[in-house]
Amino acid sequence: MDFVTTLRTRPDLFDRLNRAVTLERAAQWFVRIADTYAPSQTARYTRGRVMREILKESGAARDMVFHDNLWQTGSVALELGGQPAKPFWLLAHLDITSYALDVHVGGRYRLFPLCYHMSRSGRHAAVALAFAPGGVGGQVIATGEIVTEEDGAEVFFETSVTSLPKGTRIVYHYPTQIDWNRHMVYGNIDNAFGATALLLAAVAIAPYSPDALFAFPDEEEGQTGAGNQAFCKGSARLFHRCPHDRFPAAVLACDVHESMDMVDGPGARFAVPGQGATYCELSSRGRGGVTPPPLVNFHREFARFLADHGIKLQENRDGYVSRSDSVSAMLFLQNIALIGYLGAHRHFDATPEANLTDLVHLAKTVGVYALVAQDPQWQAQFA
């Protein structure tokens, strides 16, 4: 594909990306999003409000339409361009791993995971949240620890507060820490990293008015062992409720790719943290989204073009990639791009980590991708 010709009407694109997507801005926006608790079913009231504030402060709100509940799906979305139909969608879920409180027995509360519980044993700092009517953010009503028994089958919340109502949401408490010497980020990376990347990209390319939808679904987290319909509920609603004449030609699903060995598979060996964004061909060994071979070849060609402009996009050839919102998209279209970032311990079997440099490369990658996807030649191949 002739990328130079495709992007010829945007000669200042890469200078614009370098100005809009910096390490400092990426870190600031990530911290604000990641350190906002957003258990499933609350994302638009919590992180959605933070994103709206960021857009207003940056002056970018005038260049896009902000939705805090697109099509009544619970999803936050940024709509760019003037056409009702958006040929290219980008998805990065906004909710975090969370648990629902059960009864208080033996001095602690049993928990029901509303996520894929990956910790096999140990204790992790946690908080209990209450949400008042009217869509306001969560209030911390108790502090304590999420405790997992040795076999990982039982999980509890231990706190000095004994009067919490059943169903109270419990989340891990890991305020962001940044090692600026190594550009390592520790904290709630899944999927604040992906959401921040899409937000940065949308702000950077919005003045070009591409017809693209940047969507941030709620309720991606869920009990994956029950099958594809037990999680990614927010993105499933997006596709079901989207007007039929507005379906995209392609979807990019952005989430964490494993950088270390974990319970479901090996970490990446070929791709390296700190060396850019990553793309892969399939998720969850084919149980999730699968990228068609022609689109995989496009990604290889695209990565070479980006490299000429200092943007790094690595092929993740051997690392395990979990299912994400691609499981919703794959029931409606074939062209699914799995582009994300390397991270470890995403569901708190240890302290989650990722590399801030990769966030910058990821934001630039998806921004350029959204513009390339406007090209009639590209759409003719992948529509």
Report each predicted region and the residues it spans.
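N-terminal hydrophobic/helix-forming segments and targeting peptides
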Residues: 1-383
